[in-house]
A protein has these predicted regions:
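Core segments of cupin and vicinal oxygen chelate
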Residues: 11-57
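Conserved positions in beta-strands of structured domains
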Residues: 31-33, 63, 100, 104
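N-terminal beta-strand motif that seeds the catalytic metal site of vicinal oxygen chelate
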Residues: 1-21, 75-78, 130
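Conserved beta-strand in the GNAT
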Residues: 60-63, 115, 125
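Acetyl-CoA-dependent GNAT
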Residues: 34, 63-67, 129-130
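Active-site beta-strand termini and strand-to-loop segments that position acidic
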Residues: 50-55, 116-119, 129
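Vicinal oxygen chelate
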Residues: 16-18, 73-123
């Protein structure tokens, strides 16, 4: 039995929304799907919705509170499945991110994985199916 329910998005809080959106575009070839400003004053949020461009893909939403402090980093782990893990890790570093855990081959599980951090310290899990 299949379900029409699916994972839709992950939101991460950021300080510099433009720089963070640029990082995810450069490192993971994401595209901007939409940009929103919602609410006013302390209730205001700004968000940029990013996607890989596939019609069935989930979205990554980077958002910030213009009138409030940004919550502590590390509040979410973002996961990406990629065709070439080494190339993607290099793209992360070139875009200003850092390697948190080097590539680990897990052939018994059918994948390789690395953990990286974006320029503001958000943890990202990158998986390549073997």
């Amino acid at each position: 039995m299949t379900s029409d329910k699916r994972f839709a998005f992950t939101k991460i809080f950021v300080d510099d929304i433009e720089a963070q959106a640029s990082f995810y575009r450069a490192a993971f070839e994401m595209r901007e799907k939409n940009r929103l400003t919602i609410g006013t004053g302390r209730d205001a949020v700004e968000e940029i919705i990013l996607t890989s461009g596939r019609g069935d893909d989930s979205s990554l939403i980077v958002w910030r509170y213009p009138e409030r402090p940004t919550p502590a980093q590390g509040e979410a782990v973002v996961g990406f499945n990629v065709p070439n893990l080494e190339d993607t890790v290099r793209a992360v570093e070139a875009a200003g991110g850092t390697v948190h855990t080097k590539i680990e081959q897990m052939p018994e599980l059918g994948f390789a994985v690395a953990f990286v951090k974006d320029p503001e310290g958000h943890l990202i899990e990158i998986v390549q199916n073997l």
